[in-house]
Amino acid sequence: MSLNTTTLSSLTLTVTSVYNKKRPLPPSFSLLTDLSSVHHHKTPRKNKQKQKEPAGSCCYCCSQNRNEILIKQRPSIFLASSTSGSHRFFNLSTENKASMDHYIAGTLIAAVFLLLFVVRRNDSKKPRKVSTTYKTQNDVFRSSVNAGKNGSPTDVIIVGAGVAGAALAHTLGKDGRRVHVLERDVTEPDRIVGELLQPGGYLKLVELGLEDCVEEIDAQQVLGYALFKDGKSTRLSYPLEKFHADVSGRSFYNGRFIQRMREKAASRPNVRLEQGTVTSLLEENGTIKGVQYKTKDGQELRAYAPLTIVCDGCFSNLRRSLCKPKVDVPSCFVGLVLENCQLPFANHGHVILADPSPILFYPISSTEVRCLVDVPGQKVPSISNGEMANYLKTMVAPQVPPELHEAFVSAVERGNIRTMPNRSMPADPQPTPGALLMGDAFNMRHPLTGGGMTVALSDIVVLRNLLKPLHDFNDAASLGRYLESFYTLRKPVASTINTLAGALYKVFSSSPDQARKEMRQACFDYLSLGGVFSTGPVALLSGLNPRPLSLVLHFFAVAIYGVGRLLLPFPSPKRMWIGARLISGASGIIFPIIKAEGVRQMFFPATIPAVYRAPPVED
């Protein structure tokens, strides 16, 4: 039964009288919110004699004089019961007046909190710029991080926009990830390395949809190598018969290539490229949460994302917290640009087995040829006082092929001489939730074979395939465990190219040791045999056949071939001794490199549990 208007008026008048007269509530009083579920108590009356109820009224309280009676009687609250349809009165007493005050105060507080919740909820739905102040021990940094082009947070922060960083940004952006790229200098870089992309690297470029980045930059096709030693030469062509005509190596200006990749990445609507120098990673409870960086205006900012990928190159200042860097600098490259000259073998890289170490020539445009002279050790002749020019003219120029001699001397006289240390660093990661290392910041090898970009692009393909099934990267711990498989899955390509680069550099460098001289000559003669003896090693070098076991077999085949040359036609004790040292020297070259790369990961990856880890389960 519902309450009518007259009854509600009675209820209001009754409660008002209680507060006006400061009348207390009875001990039996209880405030009930559901009027359909109450216990009924008889209301005590002054006259115990039953009063006659007027016709048409359900109870005495519904009579014409009920308002007057309610006022004259002790104050009470009228309740209705839907179950019985009868009305009863509950007397108010003095003990629990404070309880009612508490109920009213609690109701007001709850209403205020509800109002705040509704306002905050509606406000959070609006796209906005997040602006937060972070206090540190030394200063206060003002972070003004765009929450995404569509008001959404960032999925991935990429530190560095070189070959690895730019290619990764485009790849993840194409997969729908929201990417924030921070690059120290967005102008076109000017480097003397990273200018030759092997055919295996070009295939990865095609797989990532970036093959047009080698167009419109005057890039030159590279079809193989030419090897020179003591006036003799041999041509080693890439085994490209099974591939499309466009598949080959490419050589170009590194800066032009990188700028094309940056433009391609920045064209994605969900990729934001910003100029800024990252100074540190932001760590919280062992998990990387983002980066702290300085803008070109000098403002200190912070950016946050569930995954931070560091690709800041060979001079990385962030790698120490993510890996165990063991950087070796076996030599330096001295770079020159030769103009208006023709290479002995068109569209081929040229390797001269000079004394004391190799010299490289390869085209970087339709009119220019890059020359890289390897100088062993970390100390090179001074450029400023003319020592370098004198060294190049007197020591190097006589060993340059006659077709290039004049152009080489002219390049030295022009004086545009550059140097670059050649770094080697095996991949030795420290898996850290929320962060990953890639590119030269993670793994380097001697640039003699031009395999760095091939390894970087191959790593991006592996990482792309691992991340593709994931909806988001918010569970840093689960993501970190899952991505441990990356370090093993990358090994076939990376370890093959790394090991070959380190081994070839040591074999191609001259040495006073007779066994090393024999090994060097045996390598040149082995590759000159043609057939499988040349296509096998070249397929390894080009990234077309990344098989570590095949590399080891060819390497020791060269050593055995060298021993055979020593023992035939008539072996002698001296020759046998040199042969034994040749085998020992070959083992001393390749086994330390394999150990650094990881024997189990190179040859027995199926025995590593991380390879079989499934993607984290989405909630």
Predicted feature descriptions by range:
Residues 93-106:
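Feature marks short, highly hydrophobic, charge-poor N-terminal signal-anchor/signal peptide-like helices
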Residues 109-125, 409, 465-619:
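C-terminal helical "tail/cap" subdomain of flavin- and related membrane-associated enzymes
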Residues 145-164:
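Beta1/beta-strand and adjacent pyrophosphate-binding region of the FAD-binding site
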Residues 164, 187, 279:
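Conserved Rossmann-like nucleotide-cofactor binding loop
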Residues 280, 286-287, 292-431:
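Conserved FAD-binding catalytic core of PHBH/FMO-like flavoproteins
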Residues 381-487:
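FAD/FMN-dependent oxidoreductases across multiple families
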